[in-house]
């Protein structure tokens, strides 16, 4: 069977969870689903192969990186566990990212704690992507698509019995001497299930495949880095979850408490590093398989405490008493004063409360009606304690009592007629944002009159404090997806949608045009500084896509799939260079240097094509099954108002894999090919990168209760610049835009990691 059949899909939706309707087995039997290399859980979606998920656990500690296997999906470089996913050139908050049904939020001006950073790859059981045109039931407050990640469902024992099992794993990587482990345990009866999962990941700095800089100093006396070492790529992370679930007949109640402790994580493309991130997440869900369909309800709460400062590879002491701006190493000084600064602490606290209720109602035949409501209330405080020198004598309030409240409702009709499947939906959404008054380092009260302060802090604060900051956006989204199974060897799909996203708090309510402060508000990793505009309009994307899928009748020998797409975004949030002195758009653009930009709505267009193919080469009992697979994509993004290119668009890329499966063995050789990134954002002074090719090896052996794998990434230790890695600011005097001989200066992209040998083992008990 090549793909999920319609009756099986309905049965799976109604069963909702393993064993959910055990008391009525005659109506809800076990459903076994098989599919091809990109499993399709529903129309418009692509799912990561569970085997691929398992094979990534020793290779990466970054859940977002697991999605690189899908055509059209890439990742912005960030910290070692915090990459930002991108779908067809739209990334980060332009995507809806759900983790176990929760819309988690990054509480950081650099988005160092994005949603996928709260789940370890070792805890991921399933993951799927809805690119571009998404059904309204899974889309919302996004324009680029939806990513859905789930941990394993609760498990129950047969009636009258108990179940006790678990698994443990460990891995090591030569890159950064990274290592980690994971543990999971379950105890269950027929009605109750108790579970625990935990993981730990740690790494030192990684190295490139060659020297990429001509300096070794870090800004810290006595501490230097080799010219091939990528500064600020270290990390340490611990994630733990405790779960209790109860079922009775067709009803399931599931509660999970998760805790994350991330004591340090370096960021090579950000001027700050994460020095502490703790999060408590409470997730309570109900699922009922009822006579008329499925009812689901969920409430969750996320409480985040986040801290940043200059990490081990970046200058910590600033001010004249530390040696001044021209010193490559800041000397310790005291006392903290107008001439002596100890770091630049930045803190943010975020609270995120969500509620959702949705139902899938059976209609005639296999047709379904999905309806639902969602509420999300988010609160954010972001402030920077005084630390001396220019950060003195009071705290800097970046966002005060930021509020972003979402209210949404949707209806979606899924219709099946012979070889046709159609999903038509409408979604109504209202998003209210607001923030309180602010002040800079130069005063302890929010000013409403006056000027002054270094970097025009008082002037900018007055303009912000006297503005109308209470904004409400109400809009209607729609999507229509049609699939036609023309024959046993041809499938076609067409989709059209209008999707809307309200600006985030850091886009609307950051206020200071001062270069130093703006440098700290950046979640794209380009080394520039950004500040917001309270009058930003929501982004609206009108997208059209089509898919042609040709394959053999059995779906096991060959396939070719092409998906062209086009998106018009009339209110795309891009940026313009800003002159802080005159508080106007820059009359003369800054070229080949870092600069300050302000968010601005502008007309944009994105288009491209995703492609994939596979071919079964031969199958032998003695030699195994050999398969060749090709995936890739091409994307372009243009700012139609300025004729500039959009930032961080992945260039033409393709991955060619030759794999062998024999018994418990899976072996693969992978070629990764990326074209030159020549089309870059001039307003941001984005750096071009050259094309490259890499070779990776993987071997995995799996038995019922244990598995072991080894692999080599970048086999030939090839040097290359990561096209979405951003600007290298991983060491030196990163708080400022320094003059020679100081660093970091504009012109060095973050390089990719050199050769990395890894090994992992997993045991079940």
Per-range role (PLM):
Residues 237, 250-295, 303-324, 331-334, ...:
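Flexible loop and strand-edge segments within Gram-negative outer membrane beta-barrel domains
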Residues 104-133:
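Short acidic/polar hinge/loop motifs at secondary-structure boundaries
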Residues 204, 209, 500-501, 575, ...:
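C-terminal beta-signal and adjacent terminal beta-strands/loops
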Residues 294-310, 485, 491-493, 497, ...:
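Membrane-embedded beta-barrel scaffold of Gram-negative outer-membrane proteins
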Residues 364-366, 416-420, 430-431, 557-573, ...:
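Gram-negative outer-membrane beta-barrel transporters
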Residues 208-230, 309-345, 383-397, 433-470, ...:
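Solvent-exposed loop segments that connect transmembrane elements
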Residues 155, 163-169, 173, 177-277, ...:
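Periplasmic-side early beta-strands and strand-to-turn transitions of outer-membrane beta-barrels
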Residues 27-59, 84, 92:
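N-terminal periplasmic "start-of-domain" segments of outer-membrane beta-barrel proteins
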């Amino acid at each position: 069977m090549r793909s999920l059949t319609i009756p099986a899909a309905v049965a799976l939706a109604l069963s909702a969870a393993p064993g959910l309707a055990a008391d009525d087995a005659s109506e809800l039997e076990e459903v076994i689903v098989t599919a091809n290399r990109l499993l399709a859980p529903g129309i418009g979606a692509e799912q990561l192969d569970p085997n691929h998920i398992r094979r990534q656990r020793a290779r990466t500690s970054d859940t977002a990186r697991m999605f690189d296997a899908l055509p059209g999906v890439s990742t912005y470089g960030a910290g070692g566990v915090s990459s930002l996913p991108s779908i067809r050139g739209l990334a980060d908050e332009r995507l809806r990212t759900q983790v176990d049904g929760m819309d988690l939020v990054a509480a950081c001006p650099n988005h160092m704690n994005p949603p996928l950073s709260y789940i370890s790859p070792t805890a991921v059981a399933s993951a799927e992507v809805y690119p571009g045109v998404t059904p309204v039931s899974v889309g919302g407050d996004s324009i680029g698509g939806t990513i859905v990640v789930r941990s394993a469902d609760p498990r129950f024992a047969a009636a009258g019995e108990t179940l006790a099992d678990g698994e443990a794993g460990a891995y090591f990587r030569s890159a950064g001497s990274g290592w980690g482990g994971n543990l999971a345990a379950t105890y269950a009866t027929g009605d109750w299930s108790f579970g625990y999962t935990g993981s730990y990941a740690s790494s030192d700095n990684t190295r490139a495949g060659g020297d990429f800089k001509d300096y070794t100093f870090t800004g810290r006396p006595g501490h230097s880095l080799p010219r091939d070492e990528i500064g600020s790529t270290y990390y340490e992370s611990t994630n733990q979850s405790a779960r209790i679930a109860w079922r009775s007949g067709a009803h399931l109640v599931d509660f999970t408490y998760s805790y994350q402790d991330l004591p340090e994580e370096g960021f090579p493309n950000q001027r700050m590093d994460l020095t502490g991130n703790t999060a408590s997440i409470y997730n309570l869900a109900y699922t009922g398989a009822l006579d008329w369909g499925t009812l689901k309800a969920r409430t969750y709460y996320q409480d985040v405490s986040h801290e940043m400062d200059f990490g081990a590879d970046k200058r910590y002491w600033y001010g004249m008493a530390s040696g001044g701006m021209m010193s490559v190493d800041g000397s310790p000084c005291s006392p903290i004063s107008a001439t002596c600064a100890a770091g630049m602490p930045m803190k943010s606290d975020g609270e995120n409360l969500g509620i959702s209720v949705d139902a899938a109602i059976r209609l005639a035949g296999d047709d379904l009606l999905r309806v639902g409501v969602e509420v999300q209330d988010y609160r954010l405080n972001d402030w920077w304690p005084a630390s001396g020198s220019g950060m003195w004598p009071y705290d800097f309030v970046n966002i005060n009592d930021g509020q972003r409240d979402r209210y949404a409702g949707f209806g979606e009709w899924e219709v099946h007629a012979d070889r046709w499947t159609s999903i038509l939906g409408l979604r109504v959404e209202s998003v209210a944002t607001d923030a309180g008054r602010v002040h800079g380092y130069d005063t302890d009260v929010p000013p409403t009159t006056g000027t002054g302060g270094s970097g025009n802090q008082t002037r900018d604060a007055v303009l912000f404090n006297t503005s109308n900051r209470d904004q409400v956006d109400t809009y209607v989204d729609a999507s229509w997806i049609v699939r036609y199974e023309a024959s046993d060897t041809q499938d076609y799909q067409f989709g059209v949608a209008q999707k809307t996203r309200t600006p985030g708090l850091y886009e609307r309510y950051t206020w200071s045009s001062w270069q130093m402060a703006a440098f700290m508000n950046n979640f794209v990793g380009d080394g520039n500084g950004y500040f917001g505009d309270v009058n930003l309009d929501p982004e609206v994307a009108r997208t059209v896509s089509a898919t042609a899928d040709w394959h053999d009748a059995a779906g096991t020998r060959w396939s070719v799939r092409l998906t062209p797409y086009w998106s018009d975004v009339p209110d795309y949030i891009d940026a313009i260079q800003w002159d802080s002195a005159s508080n106007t758009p820059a009359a003369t653009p800054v070229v080949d240097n870092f600069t300050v930009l302000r968010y601005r709505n502008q007309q944009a267009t994105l288009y491209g094509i995703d492609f994939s193919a596979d071919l079964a080469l031969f199958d032998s009992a003695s030699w195994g099954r050999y398969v060749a697979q090709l995936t890739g994509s091409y994307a372009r993004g243009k700012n139609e108002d300025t004729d500039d290119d959009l930032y961080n668009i992945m260039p033409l890329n393709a991955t060619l894999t030759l794999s062998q499966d024999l018994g418990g063995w899976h072996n693969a050789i992978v070629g990764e090919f990326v074209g030159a990134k020549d089309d870059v954002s001039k307003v941001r002074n984005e750096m071009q990168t050259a094309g490259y090719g890499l070779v990776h090896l993987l071997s995995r052996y799996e038995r019922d209760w244990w598995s072991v794998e080894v692999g080599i990434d970048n086999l030939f230790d090839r040097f290359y610049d990561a096209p979405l890695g951003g600007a290298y600011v991983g060491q030196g005097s990163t708080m400022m835009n320094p003059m020679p001989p100081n660093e970091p200066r504009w012109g060095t992209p973050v390089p990719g990691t050199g050769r990395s040998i890894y090994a992992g083992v997993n045991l079940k008990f």
